[in-house]
Amino acid sequence: MVKRQISMVLDLNKCIGCQTCTSACKLQWTNRNGREYMYWNNVETHPGPGYPRNYEHSGGGFDEEGALKIGITPSAEDYGIPWEYNYEEALMTGTDPWLRPNVKPTWGANWNEDEGRGEYPNSYYFYLPRICNHCANPGCLAACARNAIYKRQEDGIVLVDQERCRGYRYCITACPYKKVYFNEQISKAEKCIFCYPRIEKGLPTACAKQCVGRIRFIGYLDDEAGPVHLLVERYKVAIPLHPEWGTKPSVFYVPPLAPPRIGDDGEPTEETRVPLAYLKELFGEAVVPALETLKTERAKKQSGAESELMDTLIGYRHPEMFKLS
């Protein structure tokens, strides 16, 4: 058992898919030395295959009895082979008239960006940012034969001991979210570290600090004065992704309140544009009361009444969104 668990809440109603969080993480951690294909933070368009491709059907996690399930390791093509461009030939020497990738791209972290489902006027999609969930019951930790993966006692952040890791990749197959990666240059597993050097200095993660939509809240689950406890424990509007996988994520999502469907008469209906059945696939049955609470509190705010929940979700100031002490 860890002493405390640091957690993150992401409000999907505010994410604009700008990829600023992805850029912040990529520039900070994964732009070199065998990490080029890795996106510790990525923003997916849903419904869609995600990153790596079809990770939701790649196995891992735990069954209903708590037994570890071993999945598959995604291929390089499922992640998207990183490429560069022929800048020298196209821009400097003029030996090639076209600027082109040096490999033929077939997939990438945001390959299906802004694609959705449905037909006009009821087509729909939403953005879903993902990092390592720093789970309370990590499949990667349970699978590691070298005891190289551990949770920090002071904050529950899940890390890989690079001295102990031998690159067996069991952690990748056991993580149902496929948020552990293999660095072929050093033959070791690597993953999101929740920017722990920043956390230790009282600073939020790079992805959270750079988020222009202010969708991310960081704090400790047991801090009753913090936004994470309020959203997860008190109002229960922040819920984990795929709770049925049994890893008990420490990253939570406020589900999207989609616009209403438009009926055949051109008028809005009571049905939401994003099907509730699809949201249940992602977040389980807890999404139903979460959405109802959001609707109720939003209506209160619209009527001019006070709403602690809505004021918190607006995120006026960073100090109110990040409680790291």
Swiss-Prot record:
Give a GO biological-process term: anaerobic respiration
Name the positions where [4Fe-4S] cluster 2 binds: C25, C192, C195, C207
Q: Give the keywords, sorted.
A: 3Fe-4S, 4Fe-4S, Electron transport, Iron, Iron-sulfur, Metal-binding, Periplasm, Repeat, Transport
Its principal location?
periplasm
Any Pfam family the entry gives: Fer4_11
Annotated binding of [4Fe-4S] cluster 1, by residue: C15, C18, C21, C211
Recorded source organism is Rhodovulum sulfidophilum
Binding, [3Fe-4S] cluster: C144, C165, C171
Record text on cofactor binding: Binds 1 [3Fe-4S] cluster. Binds 3 [4Fe-4S] clusters.
Q: Which residues cross the membrane?
A: none
Q: Which gene encodes it?
A: ddhB
- Give the protein's cofactors: [3Fe-4S] cluster; [4Fe-4S] cluster
Q: Which GO terms describe its cellular component?
A: membrane; periplasmic space
> What name does the UniProt record give this protein?
Dimethylsulfide dehydrogenase subunit beta
Subunit field text: Heterotrimer of alpha, beta and gamma subunits.
Q: Where in the cell is it found?
A: Periplasm
- One Gene Ontology molecular-function label: electron transfer activity
